[in-house]
């Protein structure tokens, strides 16, 4: 494999100005999204105080567990559950 000499990159004033404008735009979007999240959390906490939970009564964690198929409740360790229904 042939090795190339490194290419020289020059940073121009226009490039830095463009970077700053894009950075400010992204920060403003993030700030707006955070404000919406804070307002959403406030309204959902008000709803949970009044209604006793979210709209379907499930927490975020429960919704995630349901989506991925995780069953956090252990099975009871009783004899029929351990050995099945054995009849002699």
UniProtKB/Swiss-Prot annotation:
<keyword id="KW-0132">Cell division</keyword>
<dbReference type="GO" id="GO:0051301">
    <property type="term" value="P:cell division"/>
</dbReference>
<dbReference type="Pfam" id="PF10471">
    <property type="entry name" value="ANAPC_CDC26"/>
</dbReference>
<dbReference type="GO" id="GO:0000278">
    <property type="term" value="P:mitotic cell cycle"/>
</dbReference>
<dbReference type="GO" id="GO:0070979">
    <property type="term" value="P:protein K11-linked ubiquitination"/>
</dbReference>
<dbReference type="InterPro" id="IPR018860">
    <property type="entry name" value="APC_suCDC26"/>
</dbReference>
<feature type="region of interest" description="Disordered">
    <location>
        <begin position="69"/>
        <end position="88"/>
    </location>
</feature>
<keyword id="KW-0175">Coiled coil</keyword>
<feature type="coiled-coil region">
    <location>
        <begin position="7"/>
        <end position="37"/>
    </location>
</feature>
<comment type="similarity">
    <text>Belongs to the CDC26 family.</text>
</comment>
<protein>
    <recommendedName>
        <fullName>Anaphase-promoting complex subunit CDC26</fullName>
    </recommendedName>
</protein>
<dbReference type="GO" id="GO:0141198">
    <property type="term" value="P:protein branched polyubiquitination"/>
</dbReference>
<dbReference type="GO" id="GO:0007346">
    <property type="term" value="P:regulation of mitotic cell cycle"/>
</dbReference>
<comment type="pathway">
    <text>Protein modification; protein ubiquitination.</text>
</comment>
<keyword id="KW-0833">Ubl conjugation pathway</keyword>
<feature type="region of interest" description="Disordered">
    <location>
        <begin position="17"/>
        <end position="36"/>
    </location>
</feature>
<keyword id="KW-0539">Nucleus</keyword>
<comment type="function">
    <text>Component of the anaphase promoting complex/cyclosome (APC/C), a cell cycle-regulated E3 ubiquitin ligase that controls progression through mitosis and the G1 phase of the cell cycle. The APC/C complex acts by mediating ubiquitination and subsequent degradation of target proteins: it mainly mediates the formation of 'Lys-11'-linked polyubiquitin chains and, to a lower extent, the formation of 'Lys-48'- and 'Lys-63'-linked polyubiquitin chains. The APC/C complex catalyzes assembly of branched 'Lys-11'-/'Lys-48'-linked branched ubiquitin chains on target proteins.</text>
</comment>
<dbReference type="GO" id="GO:0005680">
    <property type="term" value="C:anaphase-promoting complex"/>
</dbReference>
<keyword id="KW-0498">Mitosis</keyword>
<dbReference type="GO" id="GO:0070936">
    <property type="term" value="P:protein K48-linked ubiquitination"/>
</dbReference>
<dbReference type="GO" id="GO:0031145">
    <property type="term" value="P:anaphase-promoting complex-dependent catabolic process"/>
</dbReference>
<keyword id="KW-0131">Cell cycle</keyword>
<feature type="compositionally biased region" description="Polar residues">
    <location>
        <begin position="78"/>
        <end position="88"/>
    </location>
</feature>
<comment type="subunit">
    <text>The APC/C is composed of at least 12 subunits.</text>
</comment>
């Amino acid at each position: 494999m042939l090795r190339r000499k490194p290419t020289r990159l020059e940073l121009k004033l226009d490039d830095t100005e463009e970077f700053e404008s894009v950075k400010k735009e992204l920060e403003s979007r993030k700030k707006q999204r955070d404000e919406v999240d804070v307002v959403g959390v406030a309204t959902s906490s008000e709803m949970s105080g009044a209604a006793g939970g979210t709209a379907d009564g499930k927490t975020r964690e429960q919704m995630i567990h349901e989506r991925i198929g995780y069953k956090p409740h252990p099975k009871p360790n009783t004899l029929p559950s351990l050995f099945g229904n054995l009849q002699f």
